[in-house]
Structure formats: structure tokens, C-alpha cells
Amino acid sequence: MAAVATSFCFSPHRSPSRFGNPNSSIRRTIVCKSSPRDESPAVSTSSQRPEKQQNPLTSQNKPDHDHKPDPGIGKIGMEIMSIALPAALALAADPITSLVDTAFVGHIGSAELAAVGVSVSVFNLVSKLFNVPLLNVTTSFVAEEQAIAAKDDNDSIETSKKVLPSVSTSLVLAAGVGIAEAIALSLGSDFLMDVMAIPFDSPMRIPAEQFLRLRAYGAPPIVVALAAQGAFRGFKDTTTPLYAVVAGNVLNAVLDPILIFVLGFGISGAAAATVISEYLIAFILLWKLNENVVLLSPQIKVGRANQYLKSGGLLIGRTVALLVPFTLATSLAAQNGPTQMAGHQIVLEIWLAVSLLTDALAIAAQSLLATTYSQGEYKQAREVLFGVLQVGLATGTGLAAVLFITFEPFSSLFTTDSEVLKIALSGTLFVAGSQPVNALAFVLDGLYYGVSDFGFAAYSMVIVGFISSLFMLVAAPTFGLAGIWTGLFLFMALRLVAGAWRLGTRTGPWKMLWSAPEKPE
């Protein structure tokens, strides 16, 4: 697959301009197509211009200049679901694979199972802190850059591959972050076990360190794959990542019994199976991305990388603020004893698992809003905003109804202890009743990212996390789990209030969306 190192040929009379998003520092680079041996700009006339062939990855992003307001949300709703459903399936694939891994490792022994649990917790914490911010920033930046490229396609020569510096920048940063994570996790495994308070004489200690050191080799492909997923999301394509994730997870499920039991590698085999599957996922995503985009563009600039780091830094701070209330809730629940903690864990796991569906709506909101906003199609952007909020509210309400009916039988799958089950069922109102609020809060996250409103997303999360954590510290000693669950509901409700306030005040990047006239066609 030979790379075609040609980009778009814009009018030489145009000056470089910012993307339609005034909050983004990404600038459009004007590069005229030229012969490899001739550095002079190519001259394109209507008679010379070859017939354009639609690119299946990007043709859907071209603006519809004949766009007319949809009287309902039918068309937008269908587009939202076409993005959200594959994304939800991809998000659900990893937890399902974790259950498969747990089942296989559990047949080795309880100490090994506990060791893997500790190691996976450490690995996932690092992943959430550094990898998820890169994923979200990549999605927004690629969507913006691709939207501008699609907007100017009428003034350009269509090439077989797109040159999008945001894709190249994210992949290079991902490789660097992945290597750094691998080194830190491998060399720091002993220190990290100390942080997790695993004593040296614990039967978990040695297998936990061994598993973490092997899993560290999978850090680079994980980060690179997430960056590639962000690029595909920027193209509004969540189906390709789904195929890649499913292929990798199927391979993992096949390799687990072979490496663990047949070859006798134990938990080392479980780690190796996971790492191999992660490299397969990264390979598939890069292979498919390379068919349409130049992966390593010579146009990578320091300023662009700095913008990634700045926005990513804000989202790392936001992730920390997000983790604090949940960590505190677990700590406070554990102080009530093992039975209370077990009931709380069932409630929390179901609550978080259901959130995958609404988190997929946030992905759709981010991709669609970033595209329309960057193109200056503000009327269409407003339709996307209202449409995704309506779909989010409908989804949350539907999930609430389903959970009210099914929470009891679903909870019984996790335990046969009547006392634990009784405690879990006392959280039905919290799990089911909070779903509409959760759905809207997650959708608002996607809307923030769609207009690169990373600063407000980060700072508001710090304030919301502080208030809800303080509430739990005061309420938990008196009201027990009810106080903890109320604090978590408050956390989500305040996120919704903050988002509604941001939209209502029409400040920051939202000012342009509400006040700017529609671009002339």
C-alpha cells in the first residue's frame, strides 16, 4: 500500500485560516498538488480535473449545501444511532472479554484471580488517565480537520488519500505515550504493588507483578489503537473500530485456554493472550486507516502537538476529578463491612455497565457536532445539539423503565447471598431513577468535546467532584449506602446542571453557535 503524499490544492489567493471552531488552534495547511520532480504549484482547470471518485470513508462528511431543516429529529436521530450503536457494541466488547479472562484465570486459583484483578486495576487506572483524553482530543481535532477538507473539496483535486496532520500527530503522540507507559508499568511494578498495599508475603504479590510486567508490553498498541479509533470517530465511522475490537477479543478468547492450560503458562499465558490481541486490533485499525489517510504526514508541527498536549492535560485533570468521587464512594462503602460493600459493588457495576449505552451517544454527539460546527453550518449544528439531547433523554427514560423491571433478576446473577441481594435491591431507585440524568450528562460531555470546550469540561468537573465528594463525606456516616448513592446521583445531576448552564449562557465556543449567521452557500 504505497502512500500518496499529495494533499489538497487550495486557491493561492486564500490565506491560512482557523478552523470554523474558534476554540481550536488547528490551522488549515495549504498544500498544492505537484509532481515529485516539480515543486511549482499544479494548475487545475475544469477540463483537466479528473472525475472525482467518492471516498467511502470521507464522502459522508461532505456538507450538504442543499440542507433544509428537518421538522423532526428523524434524520438526525438515525444518524446519531448509526454512530452510537456500533460504538456501544465496541465499548461493551472489552468488559465481556474481561469476564472471559476472569473465568479462565479463576480456574487456576483464587490467589491468581485476585492477583490479576489487582494488576488490571492498576493498568486500567493508567489507561483512563492518559489514553482516554488522547482519544477524545483526537476525535474532535480529526473531525474538525476532515470537515474543513470536505468543505473545500470543490476547490481541490481529489486524491486517493487524505493528508490530515491531526491524524499523524495523534499517532506519533500515542506511540510515545504507549512506550512511556510500558516502561513505567514494567519497571515500576514493584512500586505500584506497594501503592496498592499488597504485602510482600501475600500470595498475590508475585503473580500480580508478573502479570503487570507482561501486560505492560501491550501498552503501545492500546494507545495507538485508541488514537486510530479517535480518527475513525472523527470520520463518523464507529463500525470499523467495532470489527477490529471484535476480531482482537475473539483471538484473545481462543488463545486464553491454549496458553493458560494447554501450554501451561498460567496467568502469564493470560497476559500474553491479551497483549497479542491488542497488537492485532492496532494492526487492523492502522491498516484500514492507511487505505484512506496518510499515516505519517510531513506536515506535523510542534504547535499542533502542543495543542494536543494542552487539551489532553485539561482532560487528564478532568479524569482525576471524575475518579475521586467513585473512589471515595467505594472507600466509604467498604467501611460499612463486607456485606454492605458487596451490595454496593453490585449496584455500582450495573450502574456503570448501563452507562456504556449512553456514553456511545456522547461519541455520536462529539463527531456530528465537531463536523457541522467546524464547517460553519451553525443551523445544522443546532439541530444536532437538540437532536442528540432528545435522543439522550429518550434513551435514559427507556433504560430507567427497563431497569425498574429487571433490576431484581439481574442482581441475582451476581450473588446468592440473601443479605447482599437485599442491600443491592435497596439501590433500585438510584440505579434506575438516575438514568435520564446520566444520559443527558454523558451527552453534554460529547457536546463539550465537539466544540473543543475542554477547559470548561475540566474545571466544571473539578467543582462538581469536590461538592459531591464533600456531600458523601458528610452523609455517609449518618445514612450509610443511601448517603453514598445520593452523593453519586448529586455528582451526575450537577454535571447536567453545569452543562445546561454553559449552553444557556451561550459563552465560550457556544456563543458562535447561537449568534453566528448561517454560512452563505
Curated annotation (Swiss-Prot):
Q: In which tissues is it expressed?
A: Expressed in shoots.
Transit peptide residues are 1-31
Q: Give the residues annotated as coiled coil.
A: none
Disulfide bridge map: none
Kindly summarize what the UniProt induction comment says about this protein's expression. Answer: Not induced by aluminum.
Region of interest (Disordered), residue spans: 12-73
Topological type in the membrane: Multi-pass membrane protein
Q: Which residues cross the membrane?
A: 80-100, 103-123, 167-187, 213-235, 242-262, 268-288, 314-334, 345-365, 385-405, 423-443, 454-474, 481-503
A cellular component term, taken from the record's GO annotations:
chloroplast membrane
User: Where do Polar residues bias regions lie?
Assistant: 18-27, 42-61
Q: What is this protein called?
A: Protein DETOXIFICATION 44, chloroplastic
Q: Which gene encodes it?
A: DTX44
